[in-house]
Amino acid sequence: MMDGTKGFEDALTGEQKIRNFNINFGPQHPAAHGVLRLVLELDGEIVERCDPHIGLLHRGTEKLMESRTYLQNLPYFDRLDYVAPMNQEHAWCLAIEKLTGVEVPRRASLIRVLFCEIGRILNHILNITTQAMDVGALTPPLWGFEEREKLMVFYERASGARLHAAYFRPGGVHQDLPPALIDDIETWAHEFPRVIDDIDGLLTENRIFKQRNADIGVVTEEDILEYGFSGVMVRGSGLAWDLRRAQPYERYDEFDFQIPIGKNGDCYDRYLVRMEEMRQSLSIILQAIAKLRAPEGQGDVLARGKITPPSRSDMKTSMESLIHHFKLYTEGFHVPAGEVYACVEAPKGEFGVYLVADGTNKPYRAKIRAPGFLHLQAMDHMSRGHQLADVAAIIGTMDVVFGEIDR
């Protein structure tokens, strides 16, 4: 009796014999959002396995932090998620303030909220427009980056730097905002909804955009709990989990805002959630500006004491202040021994810092919880069974940045 398989194999063409093959996606692929390398096992166009390789941007941040003072460590946080730098600084400052028991002045707290929401919009503009570009729409990035440029100028006017601001400080913020800047931010916040509407009109009901995103990369509630997702990845699946509401920090409990949630947990729902979050952030920005202008919003922006420098006028008249200033910037302040976890609702998810202090002027150990790291580990689970073209859409809505993933 003849073995039928032999004849079948002979009938296969050369192309059919190599249907199952491995390809490298990245690390210099434009849709890889940084230095991501995916090793994909494909069956024709269908992804059978996806293996993310990370570490190409590893700089040993956590180890470097152990040999720097607390203040010198602050700029490292700008370089983690460099799309929305101030949100990362916020977590570091909160961790130090928890251990030292410092009370942040009300005005500084409101300025922090204002710039955290500006950071959220910076992040979501970049994410939505590059997501559109990944699936073939080239107009949104041109509109979005024009708005990001305006926000970068606000960063520069507040701190002197467009990107790596180092503006938040343990105990408050570096300096007060000029009144003209607050006016300009308010003017911008009234104009920006028009841009959101333009992008909305271009993408939301667009047939091609919908086909490329709907029912792609679905995340269930079980996935969320198993993989430790946070941020938009959770809210896109219908769970209203937001640290600003669930565990209010700074003064978010004084603000009135909604938490947008999706229904299906796919790429399209995550896009819709980000669009609505930008509108909610604008509402928070306008509320923060109103509070900053109110009489109770006036005052100092730093909790003057051991961990913050004295004012310039004090240093001109008091020798103690001058000595304090010198010691603060040479030796640095000492943080009481203990351990603490502080987290913020960063644009990408829950960004946390687990800080272990040993009573010296340098941290004993600092562990950074980057939301993107936990999202990327589910890449295999989310892309399995999808087409190769869908991999770019899934990475896009995961919102990964390799500064924080590789750290």
UniProtKB/Swiss-Prot annotation:
It comes from the Bacteria. It is an enzyme of class 7 (translocase). Its main location: membrane. InterPro entries: NADH_Q_OxRdtase_suD, NADH_UbQ_OxRdtase_49kDa_CS, NDH1_su_D/H, NiFe-Hase_large. It is found in: Cell inner membrane. GO terms for cellular component: plasma membrane. Keywords: Cell inner membrane, Cell membrane, Membrane, NAD, Quinone, Translocase, Transport, Ubiquinone. It is a peripheral membrane protein. The keyword Cell membrane applies. Its EC number is 7.1.1.-. One of its GO terms (molecular function) is quinone binding. Pfam families: Complex1_49kDa. It catalyses: a quinone + NADH + 5 H(+)(in) = a quinol + NAD(+) + 4 H(+)(out). The keyword Cell inner membrane applies. NDH-1 is composed of 14 different subunits. Subunits NuoB, C, D, E, F, and G constitute the peripheral sector of the complex. PANTHER family: NADH DEHYDROGENASE [UBIQUINONE] IRON-SULFUR PROTEIN 2, MITOCHONDRIAL (PTHR11993:SF10), NADH-UBIQUINONE OXIDOREDUCTASE 49 KDA SUBUNIT (PTHR11993). Belongs to the complex I 49 kDa subunit family. NDH-1 shuttles electrons from NADH, via FMN and iron-sulfur (Fe-S) centers, to quinones in the respiratory chain. The immediate electron acceptor for the enzyme in this species is believed to be ubiquinone. Couples the redox reaction to proton translocation (for every two electrons transferred, four hydrogen ions are translocated across the cytoplasmic membrane), and thus conserves the redox energy in a proton gradient. This is NADH-quinone oxidoreductase subunit D. It comes from Roseobacter denitrificans (strain ATCC 33942 / OCh 114).
